[in-house]
Amino acid sequence: MMMVMQPEGLGAGEGRFAGGGGGGEYMEQEEDWDRDLLLDPAWEKQQRKTFTAWCNSHLRKAGTQIENIEEDFRNGLKLMLLLEVISGERLPRPDKGKMRFHKIANVNKALDFIASKGVKLVSIGAEEIVDGNLKMTLGMIWTIILRFAIQDISVEETSAKEGLLLWCQRKTAPYRNVNVQNFHTSWKDGLALCALIHRHRPDLIDYAKLRKDDPIGNLNTAFEVAEKYLDIPKMLDAEDIVNTPKPDEKAIMTYVSCFYHAFAGAEQAETAANRICKVLAVNQENEKLMEEYEKLASELLEWIRRTVPWLENRVGEPSMSAMQRKLEDFRDYRRLHKPPRIQEKCQLEINFNTLQTKLRLSHRPAFMPSEGKLVSDIANAWRGLEQVEKGYEDWLLSEIRRLQRLQHLAEKFRQKASLHEAWTRGKEEMLSQRDYDSALLQEVRALLRRHEAFESDLAAHQDRVEHIAALAQELNELDYHEAASVNSRCQAICDQWDNLGTLTQKRRDALERMEKLLETIDRLQLEFARRAAPFNNWLDGAVEDLQDVWLVHSVEETQSLLTAHDQFKATLPEADRERGAIMGIQGEIQKICQTYGLRPCSTNPYITLSPQDINTKWDMVRKLVPSCDQTLQEELARQQVNERLRRQFAAQANAIGPWIQAKVEEVGRLAAGLAGSLEEQMAGLRQQEQNIINYKTNIDRLEGDHQLLQESLVFDNKHTVYSMEHIRVGWEQLLTSIARTINEVENQVLTRDAKGLSQEQLNEFRASFNHFDRKQNGMMEPDDFRACLISMGYDLGEVEFARIMTMVDPNAAGVVTFQAFIDFMTRETAETDTTEQVVASFKILAGDKNYITPEELRRELPAKQAEYCIRRMVPYKGSGAPAGALDYVAFSSALYGESDL
C-alpha cells in the first residue's frame, strides 16, 4: 500500500465510529452524512451502488461477488473475505454454522479486525449487520473504504480527503472547463474524470472532442474507458450524478480513489524510467566524448607520423635554388600546416580534462584512451616532432651556407685557374727553345738573365698554384657537385706546373754551360729586367686583387675591405714612381743602343716583358680602381640595408619576447592563486585571452621581418637574443597556458555547480592547495598531498593513502591537480546516482522480477534509450525466465565500471 498521510474529516455513523487518527472533524462530517441519508434517498442509492461495485472490485480477486450489500454481508463470511483481500492478512477461522449466533460471531470477527487497525466503531453492532440494517451496513463499508483505500492518500502533508482533492486539482489543472473544488458538484459534467484519464493515458480519450454540455456522454465515456482499460469497475450512474443537485461525496471519493491507486503505479514507473534515461544520457554523452577524443588523437598522431619522415630527410640539393625551395616549403609548414595542429593538440587536452571531470562527477571510471593515445603519448610524439623540426631547420640553414660558400669558392677557383692558365700559356714552348745555340755571348747572357727573371716569376706563382690546389681540396671536402671537373682542371694545372719546373731546371743548366763562353752582358737591360719583373708581378697581383670576388656578411667586414682598398690606393703614387724609374731604365737602354747601334736595342734579352706591357697593366690597374670603389660602395649599401633589417627585427623581438615572458608568468600566477568568484576569474581570463589574440598582429609583423632577413640571406643578429624560433615557442606556450588555465576554471565551475560549493569553500580549498604546492606549478606531489590531508585531520595509513591516490590520480601521473583535490574533498556531499539506485529503478519497470524483457523496456523507455539497453544487456541466465529475458543487474554494474558490458 502507498505510505501517505491519513485523511482528515472523513468517518461513518452519527458519532458511532471514527477512523483511528481522523480527529473530531472526521466524526462531525459523518454525523452530517447520517442526517443527510435520512433526508436524501438519492444519496443512499448512489452509495449503495458505489459501495457494492467497490466491494466486488476486490471480491472478484477471491472469485466471488455480492448482489445485495445489506443481504450478502449478513452471515459475515464475505465480509471477512473482503477484509482479507484488501488487507492482505488472514482473519480468524469463521464459524461454519448457519444459526444467528454463528453469523453474529463471524461479523464480530470482522469488526474486531477493523478495530485492530485503529478504527473506533461506535453504535455499530454485529446484530444490526446480521439483521440487514442498510444504514449501518453502508456506514461499516464506508469505514472500511476510509481505512483501506483513502486514509493512506497524502500529498504535501495534507489529510486524506485534502490530499486526494489536491492530487485531482494538480492533474486536471491544464485542462479547459475543469475546476475541481470538491467531491460532488465539480464532477457532474464528467470532464474532470475524462481529464484524469487523459492526463495519464492520452491514448484512451480524445479530450479535444468532449463538450461541457454533454455531461452524461462525458461520464459514460469515463466509466467505459476506466472499466475496459484501467480495470476500474463502474460504480456510479451518469444519470444519477447529473440529476442530483449535489452528488454523494462518499461515492465520488470512493470512485476517484480508485483512479489514484491505478495511476500511482504508473507515476512510479515514469519516475524510474526518467532516472534510467538520465543515467543513460550521461553515459552516452561520455561515450561520444571518448569517441571524439580517440578520433582527434588518431588524426593528430597520423599527421605527426607522416610529417616526421619529411623532416628527417637530410638529402641535400646541388643548387641554391633547390635548397631555397626546400626552405620555402618549410616556411609554409610552419606558417600554414603546423598552427592548426597546435590548436588540435590544445583542444585534445581540453576535451580530455573535461571528460575526466564529467566522469568523476558522475562516479564513472576514469577514461583510459586506447594504447598509444594517452595525452602523454601525444605529448611525447609532439616533442619528437619539434626536436626533428628544429634539427631540420638547422640543417637547411647550414646547407644553404655550405652551398653559398661553395659558389664563392668555385668562382674564386675558376678565376685563379684562368689567370694561371693564361700566365702559363706558351711557357713550355719557350723553355723548350734552343735559341742559345747560335747566340752571341751577349745573347746567351741575356737569355740566362731572362731565365733568372722567369724563375723569379715562377717562384712568385708557386703560392698561386698552392692556393688553387687548396681551393680544390676545400671544394672536395664540402662535397661540391662539380668536384670531378674541378679535380680534373686542378690536376692538369699541377701536372703542367711540375713540367714547368723540370723544363726550367733543364734550361738553366744549358744557359750556365753557355755562360762560360759568353761574357758580355748589358747591365742596363739586366737592371730593367730585375726591376720590371717584380713590378710586373705586383701589377698582376694588383689586377688579380682588384678583380677578386668578396663574400661579406656585415658592414664591419665591408668597411674593412674599403680600408684595405684605401691603403692600396695610397701605394699607387709610390708604384707610379717605380714605373717611372723602370721606364727611365728602358729609355736609357734605348738611348745607349741607338747611340752605339747595338743589336739588342730592339729587344731586351733578359726579359720578355716590354715597357708597353707594364704601361698596359698600369692603365688596367688605374681603370679597375674606380670600378672596385663602386663595387665596394654597392656592397656597403647592401650591408647597411641588411643592418637596418637586423635592427628592425631586433627592436620588435626585444619588445615581444619580454611581453610574452611576462604574460606567461602572469598566467602562471593566475593559475596558482585566483581571486574573486569563478565567474570573475573567468571574465579576467577571457580578457587576458582576448588581449593575447589581439597581440597576434605583432607576431605576424615580426614573421614578415624575419622572412625579409632570410630572403636577404641574413642568418645572424647581434642586436637581440631572441630568434624567431624563441618567439614562436614562447607564443605557442602562452596560447597553451591561457587555454589550459581557462579550462581549469571551467572545470571548477562545473564542479562547484554539480556539488553545490560556495565561493568561500572554493577559496578555502585553493588556499590549502597553494600552501602545500611547494613547486607552485598547480600540482601537488604525493608527499605534499599526504601532508595536506594529515593537516586537515585525516588519519592515513599506507593502504588508505594508496586507495585515495588511486581516486585522485587514476592515470598514475604522480601528481594531484587542483581539480582532483576538489573532487576528493567534496566527494562525501555530492548527490549522485549509484548502481543500487539504477538496479532498483529497473526492478520497478520489471515488476519486481530479477530480469526484464525487451517489450517492457520498449513500453517504459523512449525508443532510442530502450534500443540502447537491449543492445547492451546480456541474456538473463537465471531460472524461470522467458526466452529473450535480459540481465539488468549486470548492465547497471557495467555503467559504473563494476563489470564489463
Curated annotation (Swiss-Prot):
Q: Which parts of this chain are annotated as the region Actin-binding? A: 1-261
Q: Where would I find the EF-hand domain in this sequence?
A: 760-795, 796-831
Pinpoint the Calponin-homology (CH) domain residues.
45-149, 158-264
* InterPro entries in the record: Actinin_actin-bd_CS, CH_dom, CH_dom_sf, EF-hand-dom_pair, EF-hand_Ca_insen, EF_hand_dom, Spectrin/alpha-actinin, Spectrin_repeat
Q: Which UniProt keywords apply?
A: Acetylation, Actin-binding, Calcium, Metal-binding, Repeat
**Known tissue expression:** Expression restricted to fast (type 2) skeletal muscle fibers (at protein level).
Per UniProt, where does Ca(2+) 2 bind?
Answer: 809, 811
Q: Does the keyword Acetylation apply?
A: yes
Residue windows of the Spectrin repeats:
288-398, 408-513, 523-634, 644-747
| GO terms for MF | actin filament binding; calcium ion binding; identical protein binding; integrin binding; structural constituent of muscle; transmembrane transporter binding
GO CC, sorted alphabetically, is: actin filament; brush border; cell junction; cell projection; cortical actin cytoskeleton; cytosol; extracellular exosome; focal adhesion
Q: Which residues bind Ca(2+) 1?
A: 773, 777, 779, 784
Q: Which residues carry this modification: N-acetylmethionine?
A: 1
Gene Ontology terms describing biological process: actin cytoskeleton organization; bone morphogenesis; focal adhesion assembly; muscle cell development; negative regulation of calcineurin-NFAT signaling cascade; negative regulation of cold-induced thermogenesis; negative regulation of glycolytic process; negative regulation of oxidative phosphorylation
**Quaternary structure per UniProt?**
Homodimer; antiparallel. Also forms heterodimers with ACTN2. Interacts with MYOZ1.
Its annotated function is as follows: F-actin cross-linking protein which is thought to anchor actin to a variety of intracellular structures. This is a bundling protein.
Its family remark reads: Belongs to the alpha-actinin family.
Looking up PANTHER family in the UniProt record yields: SPECTRIN/FILAMIN RELATED CYTOSKELETAL PROTEIN
Protein name, entry field: Alpha-actinin-3
